[in-house]
Structures are given as C-alpha cells and as structure tokens.
Amino acid sequence: SNQVLRLGVSATDSTKLGAYQLDTVDESVAPDDTHASAKTALNALFDATADYVVKGTFGTFTASVDAGADARDVASSFNLISGNSGVQATALTRAKMTVSAAATFSFTLEGKSTTPSQITATITSTTDLTAIKDAINAVSGSTGISAALTSDKSGVEITQAEGYDVIIGDVTTGSTDANLVVTAMDMDGTLDSTARTLDGDGTTGDSTAIVGTVRLSSQNAYTVTPGHANNIFGADTSELTASHNTISSVSLTT
C-alpha cells in the first residue's frame, strides 16, 4: 500500500510511437558497363521536377523536389514543410553485398563525395567477407558509407546514413566465375526482390547504383500525391495513404 507507480515513455518521436508512415520503394539500377554509365542511369530515374502534395488534418502543403534529387534531398524538402504539415522525413541508403567465388575484388564506390573511392579486397572464402568490409570502412570518411558483416560473415551490409545515392562500379576480379552481387535494402533491412550481379571479368555489366529510401512519419493521418510519374514512391501519380504503425506492446515495471 501507499506505493507510487511511475510510468515513463522512453521515446516520444513519431518514428517510435504509433505513427502513420509511408516509405519510398527500393530501387537499384540494372547492371551497366561502367561506373559513369550506372550514375547516368540513376539520374535518369528522376529526371524531372516532382512536387509532392501532402494532405491531412493540418491542411495541404507541397514539398518541391528538383530533378536529379537523391533520398537526402527528398527528405530535406519534406522537412522544410514539417513545421506546418507535421510530417517528418528521414533518409537512408542500404544494400547487401555477397560474392560468388573467392578472388581479389576491385571496384569503385561513391556516396557522399562525387569522387569515387577505389576498393580492393582479397577474398579467400565466400563465407568470410571481412576484407571487403574493412576496405569499405577505410574510405568511409570520403563516402560516408559504413560496412558491417552479416552474422555468418558471408555478406557485407553497407549504409549511407545521410541518404546519398550509392554507386558501385567497374568491378574486376580477373575471373568469369567471381562476381559481386548487390541487393538493395529498405530501412528495416528487408532485401529487395531483385539482386544485381556485377560481372567480375571487367568487360560489361559490372556497375550498379542504389537509390536511398525515404520514410515519412506523422502522428496524424495523411496522404501524399506525387506530381510526376518519375518519383521515388513508384511510377505513378496516384494518391498514397500512409499506414498506421501501431504500438505493438507496452511493458510496465515498478
């Protein structure tokens, strides 16, 4: 008796409590022949200005996104109107790498800096990609890309935390059997259904690019309507409705 029960909430932002969320689609460029051509193909995905109309109980506002914008730019545009709309945006670019055979892998990697970094790593077993992970982390100061091994070490998960596009190009291994396989991931770590196999023979199909993901979140219901078919929510201009992400469990301790 006479005990005081104190209840606390450790997080109050809309991405952690029950919220209305809307994510962009996972997208990557089909294998191209060079780093430069993969970058060109990436830019062509969003080659037009695309304004996004946000509607909700707060009213109607427009996030203006320029042609060629990456996920970071899109998130910034939504956050510029978040004070009025109540819809906040975060951006993240993620992908997973695996290899088909042991070899010395060499490839270019571009993220935050527009100057690609050179990655070289010797892999002696497809079940241990530590060398690729270490080589990517060694240039993270330039790319803003961090790398971590999967639990079984057979994969490397890369993250560009600011939402810059990631370009992986000009893969060479000196072998037609040793390829680099890249798969885009969403914010929650779910792999895209399409994996990009980059040929290691140094001729064609050795480059790709990963588009970042944007997550919109608000405590109130809302819709988003893209103003152009070439947009990061998919090739459509239909109105999109945010899904309600409810709180799954509450734990009380005394």
Residue ranges and their predicted role:
Residues 1-254:
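Polar, low-complexity tracts enriched in small residues
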